[in-house]
Amino acid sequence: MARYTGPVCRLCRREGMKLFLKGDRCYTGKCAIDRRAYAPGQHGQSRGKKPTEYGIQLREKQKVRRIYGVQEKQFRSYYDKANRQKGIVGENLLRLLERRLDNVVFQLGFATSRPEARQLVRHGHFTINGRRVDIPSFLVRVGDVVGVKEASKSSPRLKEILSSLDRTPPKWMSLDANAATGTIIALPDREDIQLPIQEHLIVEKYSR
């Protein structure tokens, strides 16, 4: 499945919630879902059909995929890995997604959205333990230090972001704003993931 390249605001309207795909715009009155809180398309306002159980499960899976910017094949791979781990499958799945480098970069405040974080990672602006990593899906581990590459600190976009760095990261990571680094101090717990996700619906879908 090809990566979606269309208007991302349509995705938020389709899922009926903010997915925070456009950075700062999502926090302003320009956010599309604030102005048009209904599904996109000609019949978006008139869709009154009650969704099926499968439809509800599918929408939840699509919502999580879109939040983290993961394609179907890779998402299924995460699910299979989560299913092999000990513990609750749905929570294992969310932990894997949270550990992605692009998500960590976003949570540390080095990008205003996950899509922007993914792009910055791909362009080689970040290091892990001093070594450049340009793979957005790289899974961080406890003890890893994620930092902005020294040469990248003077790039216009990162310079702008770092000059107003004020995000408070989740408790499983610590931020050193002066050094532009973040340290993974623990693996994320379910309560650390402040997203309206019902992961059990995803498990039910894949268990059909």
UniProtKB/Swiss-Prot annotation:
Transmembrane segments: none annotated. InterPro entries: Ribosomal_uS4, Ribosomal_uS4_bac-type, Ribosomal_uS4_N, S4_RNA-bd, S4_RNA-bd_sf. The keyword Ribosomal protein applies. Residues 99-165 form the S4 RNA-binding domain. GO terms for molecular function: rRNA binding; structural constituent of ribosome. SUPFAM superfamilies: Alpha-L RNA-binding motif (SSF55174). Signal peptide: none annotated. PROSITE patterns: S4. It comes from the Bacteria. One of its GO terms (cellular component) is small ribosomal subunit. Keywords: Ribonucleoprotein, Ribosomal protein, RNA-binding, rRNA-binding. Pfam families: Ribosomal_S4, S4. Belongs to the universal ribosomal protein uS4 family. PANTHER family: 30S 40S RIBOSOMAL PROTEIN (PTHR11831), SMALL RIBOSOMAL SUBUNIT PROTEIN US4M (PTHR11831:SF4). One of the primary rRNA binding proteins, it binds directly to 16S rRNA where it nucleates assembly of the body of the 30S subunit. This is Small ribosomal subunit protein uS4. The lineage of its organism: Bacteria, Bacillati, Bacillota, Clostridia, Eubacteriales.
